[in-house]
Amino acid sequence: MPTTWIVAADSSRARILRVVGREHRLVEIQDFVNPKGRMDERELITDAHPRQETTAVEHETELFAKQIDRYLDKARVKGLFDKLHLVAPPKFLGLLRHNLGKETAKRVAEEIDKDLSWLDVRELEKYVVPRKARER
């Protein structure tokens, strides 16, 4: 049976979950937090940070997406998952997709463009585990 991971993320939090058992239960294996993803732009700007085309918040969000993608790329190389499901709001989903390594991107089986990172594990299962699998 292939190992499936779920990534439920937004600009301030990313949870990596593994699908286990015949009931397809989710087990959280990693929780990344990016407190800067929720900060106000003024809190991130310093005199040493000149104005650029991207805002400080956008820059921090991009760095966070890259951190998640590096983690996923390393996990793929180690053979920790076979299939990957990405769940994130559209803008952050685009960042994840853009930064994902080519071989890891081939493992993406599904993308859900919703912000579900804040849901508890059992609620999240309702969105990402197929109904047929839950009814077994």
Provide a role label for each language-model segment:
Residues M1-R136:
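Terminal alpha-helical anchor/extension segments at protein ends
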